[in-house]
Structure formats: structure tokens, C-alpha cells
Amino acid sequence: MKRINNNLSLFCPRRIGTSLLYIFLGLCYNLSYTKLCEISHKGDPTAMQDNYDSPGFEQAYTYTGSDLGATWTREETRLRLWAPKAVQVRVRLYRSGDPWASDLLEELPMEPDVRGTWRITLPGDRNGVYYTYLVDGREACDPYARTTGVNGRRAMILDLASTNPRGWDTDTDPHGGRPITDAVIYELHLRDLSLSHRSHIRHKGKFLGLTETGTALPDGTPTGLDHIKSLGVTHVQLLPVFDFGSVDESRPDLHQYNWGYDPMNYNVPEGSYSTDPFHGEVRVAEMKQMVKALHGAGLSVVMDVVYNHVYLAEDFCFNRIVPGYFSRPGSNGSACGNDTASERAMVRKYIVDSLCYWAQEYHIDGFRFDLVGLIDTRTIREAMDAVHAAHPNVLFYGEGWSMDTKLTRPDVRLATQGSSGELPGFGFFNDSIRDLLRGSVFYPRVLGYVTGALPDADALRSCFMGVTPWACAPGQSINYVSCHDNHTLFDRLALALPGASREELIRRSRLAAAFCLLSQGVPFFLAGEEMLRSKPRGHGKFDGNSYRSPDSVNALRWGNLEEAEYRQTLQYYRGLIAFRKAHPCLRLQRREEIFAAITPISCANSHTLAFRIRGDGQRLLVIFHADTEDTRFPLPEGRWQLFIDGQRAGTEPLGSFTESLRVSPLSAAVLACPD
């Protein structure tokens, strides 16, 4: 180190590569965080980068209070905003939530306060008043907005209690207190459920569509909520229902479709799913009605959350208030244009506060994290601890893929599958079981077990037993063969086997479903998989990325259930779910229990996998047979009752067998015998 003068020291220069020379300077006083700083050498100035990641900034400006945003009472509303680099902050009050309306009521200065926050108290009852912040000339919505007007540009002050449906105080998670391995998760896009005219749902594409009961086809086959309830699943995972930016809420006539992975306001329900996006209280009230209706049907509600990136980083409200703070500089591991800097203290607080808010205010029972491998483990741990302090049964799981992201500091661990040991109780999607069963998700001609490839028997056995190498407990493995991403199960099979008959594809799809729904861990499947969901594009092609495809591609085709092959597949899924729920030995919680209860059986046919399971006072024999020829399977001693074969599944026996069982081609078989 060389001291240049009383205020400045020069540390050893460091050369990076062949052309860049980094020089590290140390100051004996703090720089202003609200002013642009430059270093000049011989008259050539260089602007200093933001200092968000310096220990001094975090120490000076980490705010830990619980009052960010608007705090309403009939007597007054208090606003608090975190804007540590701002020189001037003002609040604008509006009559409406329409960003095109010229209806400014007043503009008031806010006062700087502790830890980089600004505050103001508005006297009187301001319920229903809309507002924005003006931060050094940049207008922005409140990041902590509880609701907004149309298209999420103006926040709204709201008496949240006034939006509660009748009986909200006693509304609870119908599966609270049950282990995660008891869950059967059904992934649903809100719009897909109701858009078909055959759904007979009145509120098409709306929160309220998922509250309607008594909807059915002419033959009485239930649709909508009644269909989901009759299926036997325990949890409905909704694709993003927070406010996203890729749909113009003011133009419902355009029939716009999007999955919703374009976050705009994290704590606000999506306006296009409400019957009136112009009045902020409506979306809040209707989403609560939907949650209550699902709970009333015995279904827990999981919310798909997307904290890893935002719709447009430069336009995101947090970044307009604190420029660049919310996003990792120059990083695009999400492939959506930006990555969230979750490792920064106030971003972490924002994510934790948001999750606690949804669990408390909307009674959300679980959170599925999109690309959670871009979020740091500390943030996930703190979020789980904070939510579980008040709501101990809320589920946490997500996509733990390893992504290429540019962290703002080197000591950060990301929440990937490989970090499962640091995140007990957090589940990860098991892409191994997906690809082993159906084949590569990216290369349709790379086959899997149910599409005809010789199996990786050891890997498949590990998946069935819930002991995938990265999972510390079976509850950390979310088992699936289809989700909203990529092709549906049926389309993936059709692409892999273009010469296969429809009957063969159906048998293969049921085999895949049986493997997932009978494996240890947490079964998960895409809405419509139970009725052979397909997304055809014509000319033998299928839509493998329908995030903004029209309703004609994405809507569930309820009318198909009038045909036998669809009804039979639906009944098969119902039977598999019922059988799983009736047998605790299929839902074990610890590895030690699994190794004590389950024994893989050596099979002569390389396309056959079999397991013996002891528990609940009986023995189960589970057989998977992916060959196109039948096989004769020898049975252990005893009289065995068959509950599942390639065509039927349930809790009522289909027949009794001793000595051996003929297993049909491309099918599963499950038998039980008293122990």
C-alpha cells in the first residue's frame, strides 16, 4: 500500500488478462451515496460504479422495519419508501388508477428518515386513493403496493379488511399439518381452466371462474373446480397470479394470453384475472374469493412466484426508485433479460416480506419458485423461517437448476438441487425422473423408459424410492413427467414415437403416470394430463412453449371427456391417486424408512422394474413393464389381490392371484397381500 496523501491510499495494482489494469484506492472518509462520484487522472474522469455492495452502504441503509408501503387507518395513512440515494422524493395522489387520466389530486414532499427511508403522513381516510412516488424526477409505483389500478402503474391505498369474503377469518388450509409427501400437486393456468365453451364456466379466464361449482358437460361429467375436486389431488398450483406486465389489462377484447412470468408488481393480484382491473379493490377481493372456494373444496393453494427476474429491469418500480439496485449488473441467467440481486439486503427483505404478505393476507398454502437456482440460499432460509413462524405448514419448492448468473459478491450460495442439504424442507423439481421416463426434454428422439429405451435401472430405482442423490429426504423430490414448460406428456410421446398407434401412446402415458404417482416423494402433474392433454399446431407438430399461444392451443378441452379413451384415462388417474392416499407406505418421510420398507426385485426382462414394499400390515408388489410384449411375473408366496393394471386403478381389488401374474405390455401392476 502506498499513501498518496492524507485522504487517499493506493493498493497494489492488479492486472486482469492482458489489457485491463485494476487499481484499488482506499479513502479515509465515506463517499456520499446520493452524489455521482468520479476519479480523474490528468483530466480524464472515470465515473465510479454504484456502491450498493460495499459494507458501508449495507450497514448504513438496511432498513428492518415492517412499515414500508402504505399503512392505512380511518384517521390517517402513513407512507414509507426506501430510497437511500434520492435527493428529493414526493408523493402524487390521484383520483383513479388509470395512468392515462389527468386526475392529480395533490403532490406532497416526503421527509427523509432513518436508514435511507422517506416518510409522510396523510391525514384523514384515504381508502381508495391512488398514488405514485416521484423520486428525483422519476415516477414509480410503490414496490410495496397492495393493489393497483389498471396495468399496475398507480398504487392504491386500501382497507384490506374490506375485501375479505364472508367467513375469511375461519378460512384455513385443508391439508395443514400434513407432511409434504402427502401432497398431490396439480399445476393449473387460471385461463386454461375456463376458456373452452364446453367448460360451462361463466367467468371465463377470471379468478371467479375457479369459484364456480355445478359446471358439467351434458352427460354430467364435471368441469372446472368440481373436476379438480373429484380428481383427488390435494394442492392446486396456480401459474403466476401476481401482477405481470405482458397483458394489457385495459383490453380484454384482445383475448391476450400469457403464462405470466413477467413480474411487475409482486404484491398485487393480476388485473386481467379480475372482472374490473380499473378498480384496485376488485382484484384483491376476487382472488380471496377464489382461495376460499378452493379451500372449501378441500384443495390447498400453491402460488407460483417469480422472484428471479422482472419484466423490464429498467422500468421495474424498485429500480426506478433505487437505480439498478434490484438487479445483478449485466446478468441474464434467467434468459429473461435480467437476474434479481437477491443477495442484497433490501432485495432479500423485499422477497421475504412479499412471501409473508401472501401467506398472511391471502391464505396461500405453498410457494413454487420459478428458477430458484438464481436465488441465494440465505434468502430462501430467511423466507421459510419468517413464513413458518406464523404459518408453519406452508410448502416451499422450486426449480433448482444451476444457471449462469453474475453475483454481486463471491460468497453467495445459490438454491440449486446441490444445495438441498442447506435447505431442509425445501423441495426441488426432479428432472431426472422426468427425463428417465419420457426422454430428453430438449431432444425428442432421445428416448426414455416409457418411450422404449433400455432403462437406467439403478437411476430409475433411486427415483422410485425417493433417494435421488441430491435429495436429503423424499419430500425434497417433486416427481413429474409434464409441467407447463415444454411439451405435454402425450405430445412428447407422440414426437418420440411418430409411428405409434394412439392406443399405444395412451398405454405409455398411463405407465408414466403410474410411475410418478406411486414413487416416494411428491407427485406433480400438469392440468389436463389426466385427460391426455395435447397442444397441436397442425401438420403433426405440437406447441412446446405455449407461453403466449392463443386460447385455442392452451384451453383445456373438456369436450374430449365425452369420448371413452379420455374418460378411462381420467378414471385411471383418479384410481392411482386414491390408491396412493390409501397406502402410507407410498408416502414415507425419511430415507431410513424407505430403505427398511422397499426392496428392489431383480427381473429377467430388462424392460421390467419391480419393488416389494412392506408396511401398513401388508406387502405391496409394484411392477412396471415397458416392453411391447407381455411378461409372466412370478409372485411371492401368498394370495395377492390386484389393484392396478394397465387399464384400471383404484382401491377395490380387480382379482386374486397366486404363483404368477401376466403383466400386459406397456403397463404397471400393483398387488397387495396381508403381511
Which residues are covered by each model-predicted region?
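C-terminal beta-strand-rich structural cap/linker in extracellular carbohydrate-active enzymes
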Residues: 83, 127-129, 654-675
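Loop/helix patches that line or flank the sugar-binding groove of alpha-linked glycan CAZymes
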Residues: 474-640
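Glycine-rich phosphate/pyrophosphate-binding loop
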Residues: 142, 147-197, 431-502
